[in-house]
From Swiss-Prot:
Keyword terms, alphabetized: Hydrolase, Protease, Signal, tRNA processing
The keyword Protease is assigned to this record: yes
GO biological process: proteolysis; tRNA processing
Gene field: trhP
Source taxon at top rank: Bacteria
The protein's name in its UniProt record: tRNA hydroxylation protein P
EC number of this enzyme: 3.4.-.-
Signal peptide location: 1-58
UniProt function note: Involved in prephenate-dependent formation of 5-hydroxyuridine (ho5U) modification at position 34 in tRNAs, the first step in 5-carboxymethoxyuridine (cmo5U) biosynthesis.
MF (Gene Ontology): peptidase activity
Pfam (any one): Peptidase_U32
Length: 422
């Protein structure tokens, strides 16, 4: 049995490093233009993407470059220039959706494998065969694909790798093919600037044909109903079925625009789940409780195990987002000596430490605070909040940009958190 690859989102260089340190075998990300994540100033530049690739390769891990937008004719020259620039960075694969872009990429950089984006909506063996004949090495399956169908595709095309999403946001539309945002905001999802209009609350009205009066059809508390809002995908409870099928080469986590803690926690838990499967020690209830520490829209196992018409639990009509069970109070700096405050933090309060895979945490007590272990979990208590500039406080809020000293160094990219609900 081949070990499955765990693939995590990398929205920027920091998240790339976090995901790799928390156990990802590979990460995916892109540089504006055609990567379906155009967030000015918040994503990679060519320089930082190259730095990320070099960082990953030094760890013997991989980086896949997303070039999965659907270009218009007016963009083809820019696309070609972009492909040449991305090829020079030497990513481990291109993730592409459009057949024409696949052919162009294969011409420009025949040595770089092509992975087919989920945006291509592959659901059957016939479509998979077409893209395989185009030279595609791996298909990122449509979220609507069932595991049984994935097994059939693998049987027909044993040399074709299949990748599935196991966690993250889901579109109301068919694998992201949506124009709601384009129509309402002028922001085109398939060019990387979706405004997430499906997450808004809407009100139903009916029009009286006799007098034109508009009447509200559904009465709800608040301002409306989230009629388009899909729950978040969570397949942590189905790792055994997925890996036992021997059809899946990679498990993918969605979320390039989500928080650093999200990148860390999802990678941490799915890394643990995959490793536990191979050691026959699966703990699905633990994975579920830990993933609930993240903000989410409610969870569903999507369509991999059951068809859409067999279920009525993929939508959340009540709210577009809910808080997780835990609040992140601090992010440890890369040198491990300080943390950046992300939420109100006080003295004499125990904060759980979430650290990268295999990171060592040494207990200590001094005048700043203590680091200790209790029931296999590590905690930090601050006796005083001492800023980098030596200012002393009893409480610090997220608006304070000064770094806070730790009693002793903690592993880079660790997090401090507290439980906010049971």
């Amino acid at each position: 049995m081949n070990q499955v690859e765990l693939l995590s989102p990398a929205g920027n260089l920091k998240k790339l490093k976090i995901a790799l340190n928390y156990g990802a075998d590979a990460v995916y990300g892109g540089v504006s233009h055609f990567s379906l994540r155009n967030r000015a100033g918040k994503e990679f530049t060519l320089e930082t993407f190259k730095e990320g690739i070099d960082y990953a390769h030094a760890l013997d891990k991989k980086v896949y470059a997303t070039i999965n937008g659907f270009p218009f004719n007016s963009q083809l020259k820019l696309l070609e220039e972009h492909l040449y620039k991305m090829a020079e960075l030497e990513p481990d694969a291109f993730i592409i959706a459009a057949p024409g872009v696949i052919k162009l990429a294969s011409k420009i950089a025949p040595h770089i494998p092509v992975h087919l984006s989920t945006q291509a909506n592959v659901l059957n063996t016939l479509d998979a065969q077409v893209f395989y004949d185009l030279g595609v090495k791996r298909i990122v399956c449509a979220r609507e694909l069932s595991l049984n169908d994935a097994v059939e595709i693998k049987k027909a095309l044993p040399d074709l790798e299949l990748e599935i999403f196991v966690h993250g946001s889901m579109c109301f539309a068919f694998s992201g093919r949506c124009l709601i945002s384009a129509l309402q905001k002028g922001r085109v999802p398939n060019r990387g600037s979706c405004a997430n209009d499906c997450r808004f609350d809407y009100e139903y009205y009916v029009k009286n044909p006799d007098n034109g009066v508009m009447m509200r059809l559904v009465e709800e508390e608040g301002v409306g109903t989230h009629i388009f809002n899909a729950k978040d995908l969570n397949l942590s409870g189905h790792i055994a079925e997925i890996l036992s099928s021997n059809a899946i080469s990679a498990l993918k986590i969605e979320g390039r625009t989500k928080s650093s803690y999200y990148a860390a926690q999802t990678t941490r838990i799915y890394r643990l789940a995959v490793d536990d499967f191979y050691h026959n020690t699966l703990k699905p209830s633990f994975y579920a409780s830990e993933l609930n520490t993240l903000k989410n829209r409610g969870f569903t196992d999507g369509y991999l195990m059951r068809r859409p018409f067999e279920r009525l639990d993929t939508q959340n009509h009540q709210t577009a987002i809910s808080e997780g069970d835990f609040q992140v109070n601090g992010e440890i700096t890369e040198d491990g000596r300080f943390f950046a405050c992300k939420f109100t933090t006080t003295t004499n309060t125990a904060y759980e430490i979430i650290a990268p895979k295999n990171a060592a945490i040494t207990p200590i007590v001094n005048d700043i605070g203590k680091i200790y272990t209790f029931e296999k979990r590590s905690y930090l208590v601050l006796y005083k909040i001492l800023l980098e500039n030596n200012t002393e406080l009893e409480t610090i809020h997220s608006g304070n940009v000064n770094l806070v000293r730790l009693p002793a160094p903690l592993p880079a990219f660790s997090f401090l958190r507290t439980q906010v609900r049971v």
